[in-house]
Amino acid sequence: MKKLTCFKAYDIRGKLGEELNEDIAWRIGRAYGEFLKPKTIVLGGDVRLTSETLKLALAKGLQDAGVDVLDIGMSGTEEIYFATFHLGVDGGIEVTASHNPMDYNGMKLVREGARPISGDTGLRDVQRLAEANDFPPVDETKRGRYQQINLRDAYVDHLFGYINVKNLTPLKLVINSGNGAAGPVVDAIEARFKALGAPVELIKVHNTPDGNFPNGIPNPLLPECRDDTRNAVIKHGADMGIAFDGDFDRCFLFDEKGQFIEGYYIVGLLAEAFLEKNPGAKIIHDPRLSWNTVDVVTAAGGTPVMSKTGHAFIKERMRKEDAIYGGEMSAHHYFRDFAYCDSGMIPWLLVAELVCLKDKTLGELVRDRMAAFPASGEINSKLAQPVEAINRVEQHFSREALAVDRTDGISMTFADWRFNLRTSNTEPVVRLNVESRGDVPLMEARTRTLLTLLNE
């Protein structure tokens, strides 16, 4: 029995041909069907050149297991989340490799209610069945049906439920879809703005879906992927820039000067927006950078709740706490009314509304927060002995620390600064985040000390 290395901690990702092909996709579909025994599943795929063939092989596997398949076509991951909870079906699968290299593809799996299927919630079971490849013969009388459907209008209806269009004042927004799956959704949102008479102008960059990615793999988390958005904001004198990754489950924002705004500060903005409409609500945040979020949420009368990093953990904690919103510094934003799932479209709509309501630019909205809690940004270090390196750091600071937290890796808090150090769930690296209370030189000095200790 050959091990399928495309099964990762949270999803499926692999090199095409070697780790993921049509046969493996069929086996995954068959395994999903045999394990969960769903009646109906929704499928979608991103813009990658292999997504359609892998999706159809996946559909065949599901149908062979007796599952009815509803194919929503080219889509972002969140459209599969939406379709799953909106239609009330038994699960969904998006074929996507998000921001991975060209020669990769993958899948994200959910069950009923768009609940994630990850390592300890069924993904290992699906893997075991797919690896064994020992399925009962196909019963043609019980074979599932295949149907193509279009849910985009219903999805856009849902998105517009988060804002009041009457609050929008004249806005010029640059939107960079990175030739990914976001383009058609941006077109649908633009049409809806026009139909509602909203004074919003969208300047669309790389809006045409193209699996060859002529302008590079869209991953605005990388500084080298930000120039086109920044330059368009400056050239057009836009109020804000928005950029997406390939399956648009992450949304990256640029201010009116084309400056990239770290996701950490957007969490605070969105928390504030929700608390204005829902006083006293709970807000989930991750432990990597937290002081700004805790400060904003507390001042606005909400309750901040810390969760381990990662979509499966955040979603689970949000359900447990009945939190209205959860945010990670990695530009993943989760919404209770979106079945506790992450969306890349809801955040920029909310921020656009907030800019209008506050009558301030995005830069003005975040400037004070960035000054109050300056952060290093996430710094990745490849280390031969990561556990020993983390222990070395802990021993060095143990006497000085006012508090130590192990929700995710190790967080150590001091009077005027704090840091979080954790190993990656997906890569052989250690990730460091440092922040201070309004003291940039202190934050930078402590960051240098930590990096020196890690690399000794």
Curated annotation (Swiss-Prot):
Gene3D superfamilies attached to this UniProt entry: Alpha-D-Glucose-1,6-Bisphosphate, subunit A, domain 3, Alpha-D-phosphohexomutase, C-terminal domain
Superkingdom of source: Bacteria
UniProt GO MF annotations: magnesium ion binding; phosphomannomutase activity
UniProt catalytic activity: alpha-D-mannose 1-phosphate = D-mannose 6-phosphate
PROSITE patterns: PGM_PMM
Active site: S98
Entry-linked InterPro entries: A-D-PHexomutase_a/b/a-I, A-D-PHexomutase_a/b/a-I/II/III, A-D-PHexomutase_a/b/a-II, A-D-PHexomutase_a/b/a-III, A-D-PHexomutase_C, A-D-PHexomutase_C_sf, A-D-PHexomutase_CS, Alpha-D-phosphohexomutase_SF
Protein name: Phosphomannomutase
